[in-house]
Regions:
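Structural beta-sheet core signal
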Residues: 20, 84-86, 119
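A structural motif corresponding to the C-terminal end of an alpha-helix
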Residues: 12, 39, 70-82, 108-113, ...
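Catalytic cores of alpha/beta
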Residues: 31-34, 92-107
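Conserved SAM/AdoMet-binding glycine-rich loop
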Residues: 1-81, 90
Length: 227
């Protein structure tokens, strides 16, 4: 759809500026990102969510952190800004996974493929997969009462017993600094006033991911567009 939109904008010789929400699909190749930029796309927002492959699979997001890194590289190299929706406190998420998620985010900003982001704490809604099948996610609903539209959050108990609230300030403070290009050399422990485990993520995980050459398979139906 976005490819078709970009081609139509160019065909009509329109002068527009646009920004959209996406999923970090692997179909966002370097060429497609250049086409989107030429049509007036200045930025995209997408859900990296918990920045953990296990939890992304549990959510059925359809992406991996490595794939997100490659796609954000393509957008950034095309001159399109990338904003990431980030999440913490997802059911079954461990303290280790929260720390590792922060490290993934730190690396994405450090290598320059992410320009903006915001941490959201997980909230259970009535008709989400967690709300409908809480037992699958290790949580217990405190009530079956469902509110009206846009007022359908449900209180729940996380069986892990982890207090995810306490991570809020450190996650947001670190992100604020990363967005401004500061403090990449800080140890993750410095963002929190309580003991956290060391990250298990390789320090060059994201750098190695974006250095891999893009799989340049041309489909028989591909078009050549001169920009």
């Amino acid at each position: 759809l976005m490819r078709a939109l970009a081609l139509e904008i160019l065909r009509r010789k329109l002068s527009v500026t646009w920004w959209t929400n996406i999923r970090f699909e692997k179909s966002f190749s370097a060429d497609l990102c250049l086409l989107l930029k030429a049509s007036g796309c200045i930025a995209v927002s997408g859900g990296l969510e918990v920045a953990s492959d296990r939890l992304l699979q549990l959510i059925d997001k359809g992406v991996t952190v490595e794939q997100v890194a490659k796609v954000t590289r393509n957008f950034t190299e095309a001159g399109i800004m990338v904003h990431a929706y980030l999440m913490y406190g997802y059911p079954t998420q461990t303290i280790q996974e929260t720390v590792d998620s922060l490290e993934m985010v730190r690396q994405l900003f450090e290598v320059g493929v992410l320009q903006s982001g915001f941490w959201h704490q997980f909230a259970m809604t009535a008709h989400s997969p967690v709300g409908m099948y809480p037992e699958k996610f290790g949580v217990v609903k405190e009530t079956e009462t469902i509110g009206t539209f846009a007022n359908n959050d449900i209180n729940y108990v996380d069986k892990t017993g982890i207090d995810h609230d306490k991570f809020s300030f450190g996650l947001k403070k670190s992100l604020f600094n990363f967005m401004h290009g500061f403090c990449f050399d800080y140890k993750l422990q410095e963002w929190f006033d309580f003991k956290i485990p060391k990250t298990r993520i390789h320090p060059d995980f994201i750098a190695n991911a974006i250095e891999e050459a893009e799989d340049f398979n041309i489909k028989p139906t591909a078009k050549i567009v001169w920009l």
